[in-house]
Amino acid sequence: MIVADSPLLKPYRGWPAILDSNLLLLQWCFSFDPSLVSSFKRLNSFQSEDCELLSDTLKVFSSLKTTPHVLTEVSNLANALPRWIKDDWSEHFSRQIQVISEEWSPAAAIATNDFMHLGLTDAALAHLAKTNVILTLDFPLSNSLESQKLKVINFTHLRSLWLE
């Protein structure tokens, strides 16, 4: 299946997208060193085909954005990288931050929304789901956003279509 033709993506063609922490970690680690997909423990649920699917999926959107909360989680997850590549990774991470658009709202504003039970990062994503498409692996987040008719795509559903 051609990703752009997916019924999951068609309604969101041309919208800006925000990746959850795990998908942003996957994208940035793959662009840094593709071998990390098979060797880095934080990415052990992914295969190289997921990187291709993610890359093709992102072409459907007008832009890629993030939040300070997602960046913090990516940074924390990446702390588990082997010591011998951390300096190079830090440089790569810094370069990526320079080119991605960052959206944020004060934590006090986010903490009042109905999604706070999912945690601050997910509540921030929910806060932005009216004007951005959230691409996530997180079932509780995607189900909560879907129930509120907000813009979300569960990457696992795309994987299933991709394999057909």
Report the location of each language-model feature.
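Metal-dependent nucleic-acid phosphoesterase active-site entry motif
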Residues: 1-46
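Acidic, PIN/NYN-like endoribonuclease modules and their adjacent C-terminal/linker elements
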Residues: 1-14, 111-114, 118, 130-133, ...
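Short beta-strand scaffold positions
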Residues: 19, 65-66, 135-136
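Acidic active-site catalytic centers that drive phospho-/nucleotidyl reactions
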Residues: 20, 122, 138
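A short acidic (Asp/Glu
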Residues: 27-31, 75-79, 143-148
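PIN-domain endoribonuclease scaffold, especially VapC-family toxins
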Residues: 49-118, 123
